[in-house]
Curated annotation (Swiss-Prot):
Its EC number(s): 6.3.2.8
Record's protein name: UDP-N-acetylmuramate--L-alanine ligase
Reactions it catalyzes: UDP-N-acetyl-alpha-D-muramate + L-alanine + ATP = UDP-N-acetyl-alpha-D-muramoyl-L-alanine + ADP + phosphate + H(+)
Species, as recorded: Salmonella typhimurium (strain LT2 / SGSC1412 / ATCC 700720)
Alphabetical list of NCBIfam families matching this protein: murC
GO CC, one annotated term: cytoplasm
Keyword flag Ribosomal protein: no
GO molecular function term, any single one: ATP binding
Gene name, Swiss-Prot/TrEMBL: murC
Length: 491
């Protein structure tokens, strides 16, 4: 950003008083790195720490940030403020050092709220679909020439980044309910895609507490703001009378203000009509598969329509939508002859979904777009607590594929819970008699164990929120072919 652009931006958004150097603990996370990227482009000195380099830290380094791949007290020296992710414990040496030096320590959402405070904020919340919906809203606003700032929890593929600093008053951001920190945000518009029981440790196992927290989030809207909510979701329908703000509903339901009708999927694209009250119908081609993505698009269209964005810009943005990283992310189609000697090919798709509802939506999108494919899933459960709390739901959903390989639970810092492990889940699924899951205890054996189940007309879904995305990229790099050293090590 040049000096003239920066001066123009600061005429819209005042800089934080006496803050020059901002340090992020856990800077390699998508949400943390996105905020750091926006602040770096605003001219702040950025530093941060994490355990290992990744594309987020590489991008920040290219912008001039100083990244430490360790956690040491001296890393926070001279920082004006320290921003901490929810994954960082209070006894982290950098947090302890900041407190001792009387440096303010704030959560990620507090810094996001500061970015939003002087802008027209659009916050996207909900259990599922936040990242994709944030990308859709951002794409529509960009297509309309509104040059928004956006901060997303996943890679916006069209932009090649998780976050971007725009020069207008608009800020579009994913709002995270996992630690209730979205209560710091005070947007002008809020989308709520759905509400399900997830991250229940934050809410002390009380679903009513979770629901009330969403209501409290919506009450952060000014009285002239707007809540955009999916009326198909039974919890949202129940909560609507308690919102107390102007609302626009969307969904397949007949009473939705923005209604999805005549949905059909052809390959990776969805085709449908959006009916809007008092507005012309929109005949949409969406470059993203699945009915769940039609709902995400309806939310984005509801916000854009309220803003007065032209229909042709909306339609162009949705038809050219490139998606987000690890959301039904097509990694290639590979011939099987070098893999297992069979004719034909296998498609490889990587997806972040890790809740039964998300996995179910991904499976349905795959079945709808490629009904004749042999559907093979490599699944990595995420967190022992989630596996325990949603055990039966996972067992039911995962029986819908034709072949299932399962990695060990990705713990995300949790201790193992008896009966909530991958071996137990495989046993439960096997006992139901529909499929015979394969437990892959060593990730290095994935290609070797995958090859025999491929038929020559396959769609492979690599599914989960842990490090399974790295395995998906590795499978793409080796074109699914088991490696010689792999066979020597395990054969």
């Amino acid at each position: 950003m040049n000096t003239q652009q920066l001066a123009k931006l600061r005429s819209i958004v005042p800089e934080m008083r006496r803050v020059r150097h901002i340090h992020f603990v856990g800077i390699g996370g998508a949400g943390m790195g996105g905020i750091a990227e926006v602040l770096a482009n605003e001219g702040y000195q950025i530093s941060g720490s994490d355990l290992a380099p990744n594309p987020v830290t590489q991008q920040l380094t290219s912008l001039g940030a100083t990244i430490f791949f360790n956690h040491r007290p001296e890393n926070v020296r001279d920082a004006s403020v320290v921003v901490v992710s929810s994954a960082i414990s209070a006894d982290n040496p950098e947090i302890v050092a900041a407190h001792e030096a009387r440096i303010p320590v704030i959560r990620r959402a507090e810094m996001l709220a500061e970015l939003m405070r002087f802008r027209h904020g659009i916050a996207i919340a909900g259990t599922h679909g936040k990242t994709t919906t944030t990308a859709m809203v951002s794409s529509i606003y960009a297509e309309a020439g509104l040059d928004p700032t956006f901060v997303n929890g996943g890679l916006v593929k069209a932009a090649g980044v998780h976050a971007r600093l725009g020069h207008s008053r608009y800020l579009i951001a994913e709002a995270d309910e996992s630690d209730a920190s979205f209560l710091h945000l005070q947007p002008m518009v809020a989308i709520v895609t759905n509400i399900e029981a997830d991250h229940m440790d934050t809410y002390h196992g009380d679903f009513e507490n979770l629901k009330q927290t969403f209501i409290n989030f919506l009450h952060n809207l000014p009285f002239y703001g707007r809540a955009v909510m999916c009326v198909d979701d039974p919890v949202i329908r129940e909560l609507l009378p308690r919102v107390g703000r102007q609302t626009t509903t969307y969904g397949f339901s007949e009473d939705a203000d923005v209604r999805v009708e005549d949905y059909q999927q052809i390959g990776p694209q969805g085709h449908f009509t959006l009916l809007r009250q008092g507005m012309p119908d929109l005949h949409v081609t969406l470059n993203a598969p699945g009915r769940h993505n039609a709902l995400n698009a309806a939310a984005a269209v509801a916000v854009a329509t309220e803003e007065g964005i032209a229909d042709d810009a909306i339609l162009r943005a949705l038809e050219s939508f490139q998606g987000t990283g690890r959301r039904f992310d097509f990694l290639g189609e590979f011939p099987l002859e070098p893999v297992n000697g069979k004719a034909g090919t296998a498609m490889l798709v990587d997806d972040y979904g890790h809740h039964p509802t998300e996995v179910d939506a991904t499976i349905k999108a795959a079945r709808a777009g490629w009904p004749d494919k042999n559907l093979v899933m490599l699944f990595q459960p995420h967190r022992y607590t989630r596996t325990r709390d949603l055990y039966d739901d996972f067992a039911n959903v995962l029986t819908q594929v034709d072949a299932l390989l399962m990695l060990d639970v990705y713990p995300a810092g949790e201790a193992p819970i008896p009966g909530a492990d991958s071996r137990s889940l495989c046993r439960t699924i096997r006992n139901r008699g529909k499929i015979d899951p394969i437990l892959v205890s060593d990730p290095a054996q994935v290609a070797t164990m995958l090859a025999p189940v491929l038929t020559g007309n396959d769609l492979i879904l690599v599914q989960g929120a842990g490090n399974v995305g790295k395995i998906a990229r590795y499978l793409s790099e080796i074109k699914l072919k088991p490696q010689i050293q792999e066979e020597e090590q395990h054969g």
